[in-house]
Amino acid sequence: MMVTARTPWGWFLGCLILEVTGASASSVSSRIIQGQDCSPHSQPWQAALFSEDGFFCSGVLVHPQWVLSAAHCLQESYIVGLGLHNLKGSQEPGSRMLEAHLSIQHPNFNDPSFANDLMLIKLNESVIESNTIRSIPVATQCPTPGDTCLVSGWGQLKNGKLPSLLQCVNLSVASEETCRLLYDPVYHLSMFCAGGGQDQKDSCNGDSGGPIVCNRSLQGLVSMGQGKCGQPGIPSVYTNLCKFTNWIQTIIQTN
């Protein structure tokens, strides 16, 4: 088994995991699988994280001054795009580009197993919520197998190019038993799985840190997957945010 982060550099992180788990290598593809263009600004909590090299991860606005993302997306500083639909749009109406210099990983984040894969990023200024920029509540109830949830992101397409427009895909939550069976020995209770259906719908590299929304709440963050994306019977892994509500609230209140 090879597990890879859902970042553009997921292959490199996957190779690190091979050394730990003794897993065999397999090919990696990079995209949201079998998705479609989201309706413009239908996911107003979606954030895009940029470094000097360009877009590298997604995030989620959970407070006017705080964005959640995957811990493996950590950088020293960020430009955070909010209210974006078209990544290539120049000054898209209703969007903001904000600097952020403070990010706090969960103290128990485990690289390379991806346990507790979340961090909070504090924007240098608060945003005023609008039709295009709006925070989303973090789920307090854990996901139920069979729930239909929506994942969104700008991960690479089948042709290897990044999409201009935000992509959306509906996935079904897998059982804990299935997730544990497929991802041992790196499986952890901070994770849940979704996807893996015969329709081959999936998240993939480039989608890391982005939202999976169930029942109008932020249920999780795109974290990692196993080998090639979109394999029937192989769901991807998401950070299980219902386990972290107290930590999230404490960090926001004390920083």
UniProtKB/Swiss-Prot annotation:
InterPro entries, per the entry: Peptidase_S1_PA, Peptidase_S1_PA_chymotrypsin, Peptidase_S1A, Trypsin_dom, TRYPSIN_HIS, TRYPSIN_SER
Binding site for Zn(2+): H41, E92
Subcellular location field: Secreted
Molecular function (Gene Ontology), one example: metal ion binding
Main location: secreted
Entry's Gene Ontology cellular component terms: extracellular region
Group of enzyme by EC: hydrolase
Glycan attachment sites: N124, N170
Post-translational note: N-glycosylated. The N-glycan structures are of complex diantennary or triantennary type, which may be further modified with up to 2 sialic acid residues.
Catalytic residues, chain numbering: H72 (charge relay system), D117 (charge relay system), S208 (charge relay system)
Keyword set, alphabetical order: Biomineralization, Disulfide bond, Glycoprotein, Hydrolase, Metal-binding, Protease, Secreted, Serine protease, Signal, Zinc, Zymogen
Entry EC no(s): 3.4.21.-
Chain positions listed as propeptide in the UniProt record: 26-31
One Pfam family in the UniProt entry: Trypsin
Disulfide bonds: C57-C73, C149-C214, C179-C193, C204-C229
Record's function text: Has a major role in enamel formation. Required during the maturation stage of tooth development for clearance of enamel proteins and normal structural patterning of the crystalline matrix.
Protein name: Kallikrein-4
Species this protein is from: Mus musculus
